[in-house]
Amino acid sequence: MKLALVGDIGGTNARFALWENDQLHSVRVLATADFACPQEAIKLYLSDLDLALGAVGSVCLSVAGPVSGDEFRFTNNHWRLSRSGFCKDLQVDNLLLINDFSAMALGMTRLQPEDVRQVCPGIPDPTRPAVVIGPGTGLGVGTLLNLGEAQWMALPGEGGHVDLPMSNPREVQLWQHIYNEIGHVSAESILSGSGLPRVYRAICAVDGHTPVLDSDRAITAAALAGDPVALQVLEHFSCWLGRVAGNNVLTIGGRGGVYIVGGVIPRFADIFLASGFARSFADKGCMSDYLKGIPVWLVTAPYPGLIGAGVALQQAFG
């Protein structure tokens, strides 16, 4: 039987792995800037594993951008491909392109207990949708549906671009400063790596501090070292994420639970777990009891997008 190859293509890095027996192996990370197209990167990957062209029968790539038609242009790097040309060049039978956040959502179906940390307790209802939300370069939001008989459907959306919710005078003050800086304040403009400096500048402006930190990583490092202003930034970030996640649950009836993915939260996981996220998540007035029984997990698995690409391949081609 031919092997299957999966890839998770980002703006800077492309991750590749082989998918066999419901498992990943031989994960490699390559810089997209080093290659003119994905075929070149995959050829090097296969060569490093001493695999010839034609050894792989099916490929699934998790990509950013619309995936219809033969021609595909990556929105986060310089790569582009033709489906037919890709298959001919690499001697593969099948190429499946899947939205990157759909792959992330499908990856939730293979998580093990050690791949998550509990944020809010509860028992998921497997007959209801689950929310997948991911602060990273942007804010990804998707829905995961259990279709039964080991079949899953991931529905990507644009939930990261909803308006940022406010629930107290302090948040209104910060929102006003951010609005004066950037105009429309979407959830993504705050709940992303670039959002942390915006919240930091807003707190400094409102409270009369001189800003000295200029990046999300600097703010996170300062918070881990005990800086009180940086800690405020992470607290507001966590509470806003709770409100947005709770709103998504109410919108879709997401009693299947909430999975938090992406690269931002794991940098300050312990601070996040002690934050006001859970309180803000369930702070929905007459619907608070509805939210209190819904579990929330922080996903710590290193390659959920690759796993999701494997699940998509398995469902598409068996």
Where in the sequence are the language-model features?
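ATP-dependent carbohydrate kinase catalytic cores
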Residues: N94-D125, R217-S238, R243
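Glycine-rich phosphate-binding loop of actin/hexokinase-like ATP-binding domains
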Residues: D115-A187, A269-D270, G276-A282, C286-S288
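Short glycine-aspartate micro-motif
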Residues: A4-D8, S58-C60, L96, A130-G134, ...
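Short beta-strand-loop/turn "lid" adjacent to the catalytic site in phosphate-handling enzymes
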Residues: D50-L97, S102-D115, V132, I265-D270
